[in-house]
């Protein structure tokens, strides 16, 4: 099969980890006789340097003509000053909005070989395997009104409003139900319905949509309680769905269960994934650009590689090939190979490129 992909390496360690991801994808393509055509674009700080914007209209148009988009990392400390008119992260928000990417899917799975690499006790994280679904294009991050001003008394004020429509809630909740019905048939919906009106609407919509999925057990959990339970009993969860802000915070918390943010992939989809469907999506590791370790060959490429596996599953309809990559990663980790972020005594320490080579070798490319 033939596929057209837009590749956005981005900032910091982005180009390095993307190289390893494409190395693995090329091995899969060779083994299964697929063709992936790559077209490259700029996003983030490197785009600001060249074009004055964090995402150019040309790059967005390129993405829209692709079967999927691969992104590595966005962020540059040179643009951290909040007074600057444009920031690298603006490109990511524009990409999500411009491509209609409303559903962020983040698997959190602890490899057996890494249970002692996390800050949580091994007996607690062992067996952790759940999926976070975060709404991406609504809520406080896309606030209207959103403003900052100074009062006549000289007091600085700012406001961001959290707004959700029932349509926005329903479509992301259906993503949760669709994934839950093909797993353990258990869905946890996270909100703050004891305080926020938007969360009360969220909970009401979840209850209504649940009628279409009688086989799925639904539980409503307040966001603060969820934050505690993720640490106390992560194996309790299977599929979690929540709004934008809560999801942003909770998914970073959950990343520590896996030992490193360098282990976790993500998919941002423009549709509801169901068996037999191909959904346009953006695929990226959850980690940042990590500029302090860029160009040192020490960044962990596994999150990018696993993001490519998710692309094969959701946007290309290639489940066997996706499992091939995931299995190769598991085997390499089980053999004791590790990048510096997950390294422990007894492991064989590898650099970025060397980890990519080992996973490629396991696939047979």
Curated annotation (Swiss-Prot):
Binds 1 Mg(2+) or Mn(2+) ion per subunit. It catalyses: (2R,3S)-3-isopropylmalate + NAD(+) = 4-methyl-2-oxopentanoate + CO2 + NADH. It is an enzyme of class 1 (oxidoreductase). Its cofactor is Mg(2+); Mn(2+). The record marks 141, 192 as: Important for catalysis. It is found in: Cytoplasm. Its main location: cytoplasm. Keywords: Amino-acid biosynthesis, Branched-chain amino acid biosynthesis, Cytoplasm, Leucine biosynthesis, Magnesium, Manganese, Metal-binding, NAD, Oxidoreductase. PROSITE patterns: IDH_IMDH. Pathway: Amino-acid biosynthesis; L-leucine biosynthesis; L-leucine from 3-methyl-2-oxobutanoate: step 3/4. Substrate binds at residues 96, 106, 134, 224. The keyword Acetylation does not apply. Pfam families: Iso_dh (PF00180). NAD(+) binds at residues 288-300. The keyword NAD applies. Its EC number is 1.1.1.85. Belongs to the isocitrate and isopropylmalate dehydrogenases family. LeuB type 1 subfamily. PANTHER family: 3-ISOPROPYLMALATE DEHYDROGENASE. HAMAP family: LeuB_type1. Homodimer. This is 3-isopropylmalate dehydrogenase. It comes from Dehalococcoides mccartyi (strain CBDB1).
């Amino acid at each position: 099969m033939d596929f057209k992909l837009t590749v956005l390496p981005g900032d910091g360690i982005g180009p390095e980890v993307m190289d390893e991801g494409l190395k693995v994808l090329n091995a899969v393509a060779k083994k299964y006789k697929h063709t992936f055509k790559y077209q490259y674009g700029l996003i983030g700080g490197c785009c600001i340097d060249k074009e004055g914007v964090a995402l150019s209209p040309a790059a967005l148009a390129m993405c829209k003509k692709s079967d999927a988009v691969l992104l590595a990392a966005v962020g540059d400390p040179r643009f951290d000053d909040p007074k600057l008119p444009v920031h690298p992260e603006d490109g990511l928000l524009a990409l999500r909005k411009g491509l209609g990417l409303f559903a962020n899917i983040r698997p959190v799975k602890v490899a057996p070989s890494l249970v002692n690499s996390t800050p949580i006790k091994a007996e607690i994280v062992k067996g952790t395997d759940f999926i976070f679904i975060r709404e991406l294009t609504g809520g406080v991050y896309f606030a209207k009104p959103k403003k900052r001003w100074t009062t006549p008394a000289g007091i600085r004020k700012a406001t961001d409003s959290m707004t959700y429509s029932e349509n926005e809630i329903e479509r992301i909740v259906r993503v949760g139900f669709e994934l839950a019905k093909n797993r353990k048939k258990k869905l946890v919906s996270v909100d703050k319905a004891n305080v926020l009106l938007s969360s009360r609407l969220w909970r009401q919509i979840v209850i209504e949509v649940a009628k279409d999925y009688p086989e799925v057990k639904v539980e409503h959990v307040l966001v603060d309680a969820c934050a505690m339970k993720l640490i106390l009993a992560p194996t309790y969860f299977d599929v979690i769905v929540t709004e934008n802000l809560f999801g942003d915070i909770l998914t970073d918390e959950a990343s520590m269960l896996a030992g490193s943010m360098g282990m976790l992939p993500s998919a941002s989809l423009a549709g509801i994934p169901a068996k037999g469907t191909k959904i346009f999506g953006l695929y990226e590791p959850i980690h940042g650009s990590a500029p302090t370790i860029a160009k040192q060959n020490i960044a962990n490429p596994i999150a990018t590689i696993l993001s490519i596996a998710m692309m094969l599953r959701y946007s290309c309809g290639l489940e066997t090939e996706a499992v091939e990559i995931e299995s190769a990663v598991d085997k390499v980790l089980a053999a004791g190979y590790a990048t510096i972020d997950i390294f422990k005594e007894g492991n064989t320490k590898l650099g970025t490129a060397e980890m990519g080579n080992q996973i490629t070798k396991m696939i047979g490319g």
